[in-house]
Amino acid sequence: FYARRMNKLGIRLGIYIPINVFDIGLKIDHYGSIVVNGMCRIGKNCRLHGNNCIGNKGEGRIDEFPMIGDNFDLGTGAVVIGGITLSNNIKVGANAVVTRSCLEEGAGLVGIQNKNLRKGNTK
């Protein structure tokens, strides 16, 4: 019953988030087009801004999923894919595509190449 009810609500809102992926404190700022793979693990106090995807890369790699720490902030249109690990307090900018791990706490990742703004990369 629960799964059917959540599936109907998810279809209506455009959100697909399986059970037990996020820890407590998930906040979704805007509804619509949020897809999270059920094998991902995401820590406490995650914030999604809409039009996001968190999952595997496809290409037959069904066993590689992101592991994300606490206080994660994913900007509008941003994507996190592949078997990567992201540390705590990371912010991902709008429309960024994160495909590489970042173990530095408090990093700010932007763009396709995952430039870390907290390290002084401003280009």
Question: Each PLM stretch: what is its role?
Answer:
Residues 50-52, 56-123:
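Glycine-rich hexapeptide-repeat left-handed beta-helix
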